[in-house]
């Protein structure tokens, strides 16, 4: 074997190990030639395909260029058309303006020519529109009141500018309603002075709320904070506060004036005797009982008698003279007669001497009374008769001496409760009792005060009595957060500042009735719990045995229970 073959065999590897190198050499040469011929054919075909695609792309480019040219031509044509239209419209507007100027000149000439030419003038098509509005306004005297409020010299004739302004304002109010402006327009004043009685009868059944806004169907108030409403037909409490009374006012004057709204009693508070209600609506206007010589001898005055602390009988001059000197003959230790007691007690602040008897107390006039009406409807009628000022509702009290301007403060039943959110449940263990709440304060005002001070307020209630549903001077505040509740009851006292109210109120845990003992009560056995431990270590209700059992430890000796009424 030649040297060249041996070298080739060594290159071929193990396939020529058995001496087959010559056959493999022939096969490899033929395969190489075939591969080269295939490559040449493939290259020729690729060149032809590239030429074809190039031609196609060239045609596509030409088509795109043609389309772009067409679009540009169309845009130019549209621009030309638009410019022509705009020019034509401007020319038409100029022509119309010239025509209007010419017609105005003709109208002025026709007015100057005389009454004969006035009859030949064409009728304005808008004149019927203005005439309809004039006829509509003629039946509404409040429109004249509105015009005269703007211009005092205005007449009954409604001019076109006013009608145009009214129409534009009406359309704007329909598109963008304004509740306050609608309320003002609804409450337009009646210009007829003599028609006051008719106006009062028409509004007799209206419901006036404490913030002087029109109530909604729930008898509540328009505010995003108010979620409460009245349950039942009543709106106001039958107990009404009347303030601003002078010292010379008499109870007979009060009864005589306010009895026009319904049967009532007068609750006259004083510093020494508390509240006395001695005028009964069932027998009012009947013959009065003869008053005794002194109110000290009357332990329980009969119903129907005017309050003995007030009398409409003026004291005799002799009585006044005796009361000034202290005795009949100028001696010492004068005995107080009926005239002297009436002067000291009825008018309040008398300067007569004190009695040497069994320590008679002199009544001091507080300047306010409470009216206890028999029906809630009477309070509504009273409120409709009042007039509004910045401080509240007022009415003119007609007395025997002179008319008196007094304040009327009704209590709206919806103001006794306030809910922050219906979705938050109320935990009875996180309810605080608020003592010393001013009576004019509403639940929503108390809620906002505690919300700003402690936060997490859920519900607020004002305690009211069962008979008249009038505030008792206390309230309840429910919290949703334990730490806020603990902070409130640990402070114990807080000063409440609201408008003209500046008073210190007491905060302590609220005790609920009919609570079961949380220490020994189970599902089938409920033990009444009269004690509640507000300490953070306990903080639960206990029955008496469990209280002694749980507080027998030295660490709980100092815990003080909360009991109802203490």
Curated annotation (Swiss-Prot):
Keywords, sorted A to Z: RNA-binding
Gene3D superfamilies the record matches: 3.30.70.330, Cytoplasmic polyadenylation element-binding protein, ZZ domain
Compositionally biased intervals (Acidic residues): 87-98
The organism's taxonomic lineage, starting at the top: Eukaryota, Metazoa, Ecdysozoa, Nematoda, Chromadorea
Protein name according to UniProt: Cytoplasmic polyadenylation element-binding protein 2
Record has RNA-binding as a keyword: yes
Region (Disordered): 17-46, 64-98
CDD domains: Bbox1 (cd19757), RRM2_CPEB2_like (cd12726)
PROSITE patterns, A to Z: RRM
Stated role: Cytoplasmic polyadenylation element binding protein that binds to and regulates the translation of specific mRNAs.
The RRM domain, residue ranges: 430-512
Molecular function GO labels: mRNA 3'-UTR binding; mRNA regulatory element binding translation repressor activity; ribosome binding; translation factor activity, RNA binding
A GO BP annotation: negative regulation of cytoplasmic translation
Domain of life of the organism encoding this protein: Eukaryota
GO cellular component, one term: nucleus
